[in-house]
From Swiss-Prot:
The gene is dut. SUPFAM superfamilies: dUTPase-like. Its EC number is 3.6.1.23. One of its GO terms (molecular function) is magnesium ion binding. This is Deoxyuridine 5'-triphosphate nucleotidohydrolase. Pfam families: dUTPase. Its cofactor is Mg(2+). Substrate binds at residues 68-70, 81, 85-87, 95. Pathway: Pyrimidine metabolism; dUMP biosynthesis; dUMP from dCTP (dUTP route): step 2/2. It catalyses: dUTP + H2O = dUMP + diphosphate + H(+). Transmembrane segments: none annotated. InterPro entries: dUTPase, dUTPase-like, dUTPase-like_sf, dUTPase_trimeric. The keyword Transport does not apply.
Amino acid sequence: MQKLAVKIKKLENFHGDLPQYQSLGASGFDVRAQLAGPVVLNPGERAMIPTGLSFEIPLGYEIQARPRSGWAAKSGLTVLNTPGTIDADYRGEVKIIVINLGNEAVTINDQERCAQLVLAPVIQAQFELVNELSDTERGAGGFGSTGRA
């Protein structure tokens, strides 16, 4: 598996261990909530959860913040803007926007794993303005237009 150096900085609010991959084939690493006290989210509520970390991501890459499947399945908590994008030129604290999609209030505690981060390559588009686009069988159909008999 390919490895790429990514600089990581612990901020003043960080305590605990640095994130690490949990298996040889893992594509993501978990980050933990850095909280002064518990955060309670009622159904439909959202919060920004600090991770206490910032990154220096190599140009041509991004880090994506994704929900942890176990967290979502057990509690209804998920990352709101999935995947959240952390751009290569961002140097601030990574915060995770979580929302409670469940039916009961959920408490997020300090050091709880709140998201998984995945390093991913980025390709920027070079836009070309045209008057017409090529035809396809699908055309302009969208939002449920495919798969019909």
